[in-house]
Structures are given as structure tokens and as C-alpha cells.
Amino acid sequence: MVVVSPKMANATPNGSVPHNHVGAVLLTIPTIKIDGKQTLATEDHTSIDYLQRAQWLRAAILGANDGLVSVASLMMGVGAVKRDAKAMLLAGFAGLVAGACGMAIGEFVAVYTQYEVEVGQMKRDMNMSVGGERDLEMEMERRTLPNPLQATLASALCFSIGALVPLLSAAFIENYRTRIIVVVAMSCLALVVFGWVGAKLGKTPK
């Protein structure tokens, strides 16, 4: 909170203070113009750790693209053998369940291994001297370590979302040729959307 001396009320229009008001303090508050009006300039103190976000964002984008491409390819492969919408949908749903489970397990093992390697390296660097446990906890809080559970949930959920695109695209189309065209078109469009979402969430430079 800023307290302004009452003597400042006698300041001249150009912002200077008369000599007889020696004790007055002139504070300059930066302003910015918005639509021709002067407004106070404020700083955005909201800080987001994008390195931490990148841990689950990588798993999410990978899972979404994998679910989209793998399930769409599986459905088109089954459709080439049997041009039946029901067979394609059953194959796609089976691919969704199996793929989501596989991505979740694989992501958890991979990220947890990375977590253990980084923690082990931190212990070796600190030599675990006297007070090393406390220093290790402080260092772990300071550094951005991977979160296995977060990456697992992001990967499985986004794989399912990606797999739903070809499934929903083919669910209501009877003609085989039209069904394949719609699945391919929607899959290509979804790839662009997933890439755009990843760029926006990651705040990548334009």
C-alpha cells in the first residue's frame, strides 16, 4: 500500500513539487493506453511451469495421435476384408481398449524409469553427505521431475479420445467407400487439431 503525502495536492500541473514542500515524495506509476484511455500498468505474476506441463503434454499428444492413426488403420484393414460397418466398429473398439491399456502401462514404466534415473543421479551428485536427505528433498522440489501417474492418465485418456474420431466417423455411414473416405478425412483433420492444441498448451513460439 502506498501512502501519499497531502502536500502532493499542491503539485504543479507539470508534475513538479514546489520548493517549500521538501518532504513530499513524487511517485511515478507507469500507465498504458488502451483505446485512448490511461490505465494502470500491472504485471502478470501468474507463472506456469511449462517444463512440468511438457511432461504430460508429450504423453497426451503421443497418445492422441497413436490412438487416431492405429485405430483408423485397423478399421480400414478389417474393412478391406469384410465391408461391414459392424465388423469395422468392433475391431476399432477392441483396438481402443487394448491400445489405451498398452499406452498406459508402457508410459508408466517408461516415465517411472526416467524418474528413478534422475533421482539416482541427483543422489550421486550430492554424495548423500550429512543432511543429504533434506537437501535431496529440497532439490526434488526445485527441479522438474517427471510424474509417472500424470503421464499415464494423459496417455490413456488421449489415446481413447483419438481413437473415438474414426469410430464415430464410421458409425453412421452404410456405404463402404463413403465410410473409408470420411474416416480418412476426419483422421487427417484431427491430426491438425491435435497439433494445434499441443502448440497452444505448450505456448510454442509462432
From Swiss-Prot:
Biological process annotations from GO: intracellular manganese ion homeostasis; nodulation
Main location: membrane
Keywords of the record: Ion transport, Iron, Iron transport, Membrane, Metal-binding, Nitrogen fixation, Nodulation, Transmembrane, Transmembrane helix, Transport, Vacuole
Gene Ontology molecular function terms on file: iron ion transmembrane transporter activity; manganese ion transmembrane transporter activity; metal ion binding
Cellular compartments per GO CC: membrane; vacuolar membrane
Subcellular location: Vacuole membrane
Physiological role: Vacuolar iron transporter that is required for the accumulation of Fe(2+) ions in the fixation zone of the root nodules. Plays an important role in maintenance of symbiotic nitrogen fixation activity, for example during symbiosis with Bradyrhizobium japonicum.
Keyword rRNA-binding (UniProt): no
Effect of mutating G202K: Reduces the efficiency of iron transport
Family: Belongs to the CCC1 family.
Membrane topology: Multi-pass membrane protein
Coiled coil: none
Keyword rRNA-binding appears in the UniProt entry: no
Pfam (any one): VIT1
Listed name of the protein: VIT-like transporter 1a
Annotated tissue distribution: Highly expressed in the fixation zone of the root nodule. No or low-level expression in root, leaf and stem.
Catalytic function, reaction form: Fe(2+)(in) = Fe(2+)(out)
Induction: No significant changes in expression observed in response to short- or long-term iron deficiency in nodules.
Superkingdom of source: Eukaryota
Residue ranges crossing the lipid bilayer per the database entry: 61-81, 89-109, 153-173, 180-200
